Amino acid sequence: MLSEASDFNSSGSRSEGSVFSRTEHSVIAAYLIVAGITSILSNVVVLGIFIKYKELRTPTNAVIINLAFTDIGVSSIGYPMSAASDLHGSWKFGHAGCQIYAGLNIFFGMVSIGLLTVVAMDRYLTISCPDVGRRMTTNTYLSMILGAWINGLFWALMPIIGWASYAPDPTGATCTINWRNNDTSFVSYTMMVIVVNFIVPLTVMFYCYYHVSRSLRLYAASDCTAHLHRDWADQADVTKMSVIMILMFLLAWSPYSIVCLWACFGNPKKIPPSMAIIAPLFAKSSTFYNPCIYVAAHKKFRKAMLAMFKCQPHLAVPEPSTLPMDMPQSSLAPVRI
């Protein structure tokens, strides 16, 4: 019980207002510091690659650039505030800091799921509906990306203005949705978030990648030129990277979703403290593994990273074919003013 938590001088004692000991808080703080530094550096490298090599600045990769910004946002704000509170033994930034911290984490998380949905739609239109995909303009992509940011902002602001609320969790070192107060406001907010930012995006992603996988299988069973084979291989690389990112994102946010659903339909007091800290740690983890996915699953991005480290001014990118499926994204239909 939080009211029974006491503050002793020994390093293994419980911190005031927390269910964790000083030692446990210190271990978590060390993890957050290392993860935060790793995340910031790796995502800065990602942005540097896109800045240096214009060959990679396609509308699809514009979504990846925005994902990198969301990762940097969590890493530069969420990690330091949480780590400082863990070192302190309890939340140290007051009520206003709690609202800012929790709001920004929800904001960047919701934006990320929106951007991953945009990636899935892009893969579907590029591979399975090329006639439609070719007609998409830069403004179309910008509108979808902006929609993801606006959606994230809406759900982040709602607890601040009264629909549900933000509060420190039982560990006392992080702020999140106040799931210990499972009133009607919390339940309605949580269920709407799950429907709008989990069930609907997953349905869209499943539909898109189901049809993309069918298109890729049909290609594999057909005869084609070496030139077209290279184009399809590039598209398959991007699709593989996208699917891995989505699966890892779901893995990262699943503990948080479980905690919220448990609080909605069960007794919040029975949620284990370990689950309370694992949920936000898992949710933040996507910030540093996304760059690893880019490198591991996308050959062109991997070559670009190596080229940047070797200080090569240009990236050798083969000319794509002019067949409908793989029209280069740089030749999208002109933006209509």
UniProtKB/Swiss-Prot annotation:
Tissue: Found only in the eye, where it is localized to the retinal pigment epithelium (RPE). In the RPE, it is localized to the microvilli that surround the photoreceptor outer segments.
A GO BP annotation: visual perception
Membrane topology field: Multi-pass membrane protein
UniProt keyword list: Chromophore, Disulfide bond, G-protein coupled receptor, Glycoprotein, Membrane, Photoreceptor protein, Receptor, Retinal protein, Sensory transduction, Transducer, Transmembrane, Transmembrane helix
Bilayer-crossing regions: 27-49, 62-87, 102-121, 141-164, 189-212, 241-264, 273-297
Extracellular membrane side: 1-26, 88-101, 165-188, 265-272
Domain of life: Eukaryota
Residues modified as N6-(retinylidene)lysine: K284
Coiled coil location: none
Gene3D superfamilies, A to Z: Rhodopsin 7-helix transmembrane proteins (1.20.1070.10)
Any Pfam family the entry gives: 7tm_1
GO annotations of cellular component type: membrane
Cellular localization per UniProt: Membrane
Membrane keyword on record: yes
Residues that carry a glycan: N9, N182
SUPFAM superfamilies noted in UniProt: Family A G protein-coupled receptor-like (SSF81321)
Primary role: May play a role in rpe physiology either by detecting light directly or by monitoring the concentration of retinoids or other photoreceptor-derived compounds.
Name the UniProt record assigns to this protein: Visual pigment-like receptor peropsin
Species of provenance: Mus musculus (Mouse)
Gene: Rrh
